[in-house]
C-alpha cells in the first residue's frame, strides 16, 4: 500500500468497485496491466474484507459520503486497514501508537525495523523475511502513515495525531460495535486505535449531541455502549 502514489485514487476505486460492481479501469490511468492487477489486489486485500454486510455498508457509505472531507476519509481508510490487516494493526499498536501515547513526537524507520525483527525472531514461521524485505516494509509502513496524514518529515517522522470530528467519532463508535458486537465497552479493540484516551472517549460518548445515537451505562469506570 505504501507504493500507491495517491490515496484519492484508492478512494475513487473503492467507490466505483467496492460493492462488487465492475468499472472502466482505464479511468485510473495505470501504465501496465500488471500495475493494475497489483493495485486491485492491494486494495482488496487491505480494505475490502468485511466482518458482516453491516460493516461493508458502513465503510462504503462513509467513503461515498459528502459529510466527510478527504482527510476524514483517510482516517476511515486507516480504521479499515486496522480491521483487515493483522500485520499493519500489530505494527501500529506496538510501534506507532506506543510512541504516540508515551509522548514521543516522532518515530523512525529503525523503530519499525526493530519490531519486525522481533516478530521474525519470535515467530519465524509467520514472518520469514530477509533483512532487505524488512527494511523495505518498514519504509513502506512509514510512507503509509504519511499518506494517511499521521506523519510528516523524511528520516524522522513527526507524529501528527488527527482531530476526530463529530462525524468521525460517530463513525468510529458504530464501526467498533459493528466489527466487535460482543465488545460494547472501552475494551473494544478498535478504541485502542482512536487517538483518544479512555477518559476522552467517555466524555465524548456522554456529549448531548450523541444522546439520539446510543445509550450509555456506567458503573464506576466501566462503561457499556448500546446503539439505538
Can you annotate each of these PLM segments?
Residues 1-98, 107:
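Eukaryotic partner-binding/assembly regions in large regulatory complexes
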Residues 86, 106, 135-139:
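Alpha-helix initiation and capping sites
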Residues 103, 117-137:
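Short, positively charged loop/turn segments that connect secondary-structure elements
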Residues 146-223, 227:
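Accessory, usually C-terminal, subdomains that scaffold auxiliary metal cofactors
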Residues 31-39, 131-147, 196-207:
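Short amphipathic alpha-helical interaction segments
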Residues 49, 98, 118-122, 144-151:
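Amphipathic alpha-helical interaction surfaces
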Residues 43, 47, 116, 205-209:
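Hydrophobic, Leu/Ile/Phe/Ala-enriched alpha-helical segments that form helix-helix packing faces
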